[in-house]
Amino acid sequence: MIPDPRDIILRPVVSEKSYGLLDENVYTFIVRPDANKTQIKLAVQKIFNVRVTRVNTINRAGKRKRTKHGWGHRSATKRALVSLAPGDSIEIFGGPGA
């Protein structure tokens, strides 16, 4: 069964690096860990009505963190760097140079 596109893309990444990539028409999203590049591409195209040229994915391991009661773990995440065709953009952060 093909999941709903809004279930694949969880949220955009808000960081200095992701803001810097906006100038290169590359957008960064947190995605489901079991999503593949084809599913991510189709989901972004359907949700934002843009043309995707490339998708790169990064699996980030969760960090081990000290808590009051011992050790805990942050959740592992999967990020997708989505490159759009020239002329297309997504207004999620106000756009490049905003």
Swiss-Prot record:
Swiss-Prot/TrEMBL GO biological process terms: translation
Entries under Pfam families matching the protein: Ribosomal_L23 (PF00276)
GO molecular function: rRNA binding; structural constituent of ribosome
One GO location term (cellular component): ribosome
Gene3D superfamilies noted in UniProt: 3.30.70.330
Keyword hit for rRNA-binding: yes
Record keywords, A-Z: Ribonucleoprotein, Ribosomal protein, RNA-binding, rRNA-binding
InterPro entries (alphabetical): Nucleotide-bd_a/b_plait_sf, Ribosomal_uL23-like, Ribosomal_uL23/eL15/eS24_sf
Assigned protein family: Belongs to the universal ribosomal protein uL23 family.
HAMAP family linked: Ribosomal_uL23_B (MF_01369_B)
Function according to Swiss-Prot or TrEMBL: One of the early assembly proteins it binds 23S rRNA. One of the proteins that surrounds the polypeptide exit tunnel on the outside of the ribosome. Forms the main docking site for trigger factor binding to the ribosome.
Quaternary data: Part of the 50S ribosomal subunit. Contacts protein L29, and trigger factor when it is bound to the ribosome.
Protein name: Large ribosomal subunit protein uL23
Source organism of the structure: Parafrankia sp. (strain EAN1pec)
